[in-house]
């Protein structure tokens, strides 16, 4: 008589739970977003703009520290 409840409890523990529809949808959305992010390619113009911005900041810092950088830019 005790075997049947124990068997049912073990069966419930061993069986996979039904996936929650909301969790399943969130997981699929996250997977889709990750795949889209992986497929994105950085535009070459964006990279050039970033490098130009960094070099402008570096020139400003260099001009504050020494005049040599500013003289090189004027030539």
From Swiss-Prot:
Coiled coil: none annotated. Residues 1-19 form the signal peptide. The modification Pyrrolidone carboxylic acid is found at residue 60. Contains 2 disulfide bonds that can be either 'C1-C3, C2-C4' or 'C1-C4, C2-C3', since these disulfide connectivities have been observed for conotoxins with cysteine framework V (for examples, see AC P0DQQ7 and AC P81755). Keywords: Disulfide bond, Neurotoxin, Pyrrolidone carboxylic acid, Secreted, Signal, Toxin. It is found in: Secreted. Expressed by the venom duct. GO terms for molecular function: ion channel inhibitor activity; toxin activity. Pfam families: Conotoxin. One of its GO terms (cellular component) is extracellular region. Residues 20-59 form a propeptide. Belongs to the conotoxin T superfamily. The cysteine framework is V (CC-CC). This is Conotoxin Vn5.5.
């Amino acid at each position: 008589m005790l075997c049947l409840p124990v068997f049912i409890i073990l069966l419930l523990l061993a069986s996979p739970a039904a996936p929650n529809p909301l969790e399943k949808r969130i997981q699929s959305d996250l997977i889709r977003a990750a795949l889209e992010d992986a497929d994105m390619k950085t535009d070459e113009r964006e990279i050039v703009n970033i490098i130009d911005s960094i070099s402008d900041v570096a020139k400003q810092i260099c001009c504050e520290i020494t005049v040599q950088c500013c003289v090189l830019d004027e030539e």
